[in-house]
Structures are given as structure tokens and as C-alpha cells.
């Protein structure tokens, strides 16, 4: 065998991050549809006995029909036992209880940024896709227990869903900071930093759902399965069995099967897209 061919679905609508960049903030009806599809995606992964571990807007792709599909299973693991952090030997002394019982001066400084300032900074940063590609991993959606030394399970994916819902409705992730290191500090001491700004004007049910997911692992909504989330008042009268038949808020306008207008355009000198890997347009 000299060649290996991978046959995959082509999802021409781009990724969900691109949609968020375009829309900035989604209304409650739009957010309800997309978070419902995310819940179904994670439910399917968990039913296979897996943990996705890398749920973020960039890994949610939009199909020709406008529906979401989950991608990038490079960090996924089977959930037979509790998993330990990415580097437990290095992180063993970094548990939330042991090392961050008091906020450092730098951490206290992080709490002072207001809603409008965070929103503006995040909008500028996420529009810089080259910056995004050059960053090895994004910590914004990682659950706090991943940084600890007690292990974790499928509940980490539900934290990520809550963070993405917050971003959809507020305009930035709840623990966004100027640097990945500062973001990690915020997540580790999340109870000190987590706040839903009144300026965002979220409904009671939306606020309740976010707080139920961005919560301690042992109390997190979804810990006992996706049905917990489906029964939340935020989804009152939502027809879970008909999701695939619902019209998505955004449907890509595709001219033909080769239309890639919803994908990032790479420059000729882009180091992340070598010339030899490009497909000729002719």
C-alpha cells in the first residue's frame, strides 16, 4: 500500500467561530438552536464512551444545510476511568485548593476589566485568525478540573458548552484575558472571576443554564447525562426530536460544490499553508 485516502464530509459553511465573528452576539432564539445542537453532538460522543475534551467554536463546523457537526477528535479519550491532566507530573502541586487559595496581585488586577472593555478586546483578537492559528491550543473553554490533580470525566465537555453559550450571548468567553496564562489563572479560580454582566441583558433561563454548566464538576448540569440539559427551562417547548428538521438561523449561500467562501483565505506566503499542499483552481 503506497497511499492512504481519507473520505470525509465537506462542510462548506465554515466553522462556528467564523459565524460568531460575523454576528458578534446571537439572540436567545439563535443561541437556543445552536446550543441544542451542541448538546446533541456531545451526547452522541458520550454515548460512545468518549470525552471530546476540545469543544470550542472552531471545532463546530457548519454544513450545507446550516446544521452543526462536531469535528477534531485529536484530544478525545475513552471515559472508562477518570482522566488526569495533560501533565500530571508537572501539575501535581497546582490544584485549585492548594496553590490558589488567595488571589495574587496579578489575579486581583484581572478582576478589574469591565464588560465593554473585554468585549472590545475579544472582538479585535478573534478577528485575527493568524493569531489564532499560531496559538497552540486555546484555554478559554477548558474546565478547571483539567488543571487540577484529581482527574476528570465527561463533565468537562458540559463546562465547554456553557462557556460557548456565554460567548454566544455576551460576546466573549467568561474567562477571556490578554494572555493564555492569565486566562488559565482565571479558570483555575473561576468562582472569583465568573460573572454574567447585567449589560448583556440575558433572560433568567439563559442565565440559569449558563450557571448550571459553568459550575463545580460534582454539581454540573449534564453530569448525569444530556437529558438533564434538555429538561432545563431554557428549552421549554423546544422539540428535541425535530432538531434536524428545524431551519437553522444561518444557512450558507453556496454557489457550487467547490465554493469555499466561508473558509479563511491564506496568503501565498502563509507558513501554515505550504504551496505544495494547495489545490489548483484551474
Model-derived regions: residue spans:
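C-terminal regulatory tails of eukaryotic serine/threonine kinases
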Residues: 84-124, 222-282
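Protein kinase catalytic-loop region centered on the HRD/HxD motif
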Residues: 40-50
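Activation segment signature within eukaryotic-like protein kinase domains
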Residues: 34-35
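AlphaC helix of the protein kinase catalytic domain
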Residues: 17-26
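Conserved short submotifs of the Hanks-type protein kinase catalytic core
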Residues: 2-15
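Conserved end of the kinase activation segment
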Residues: 127-131, 145-155
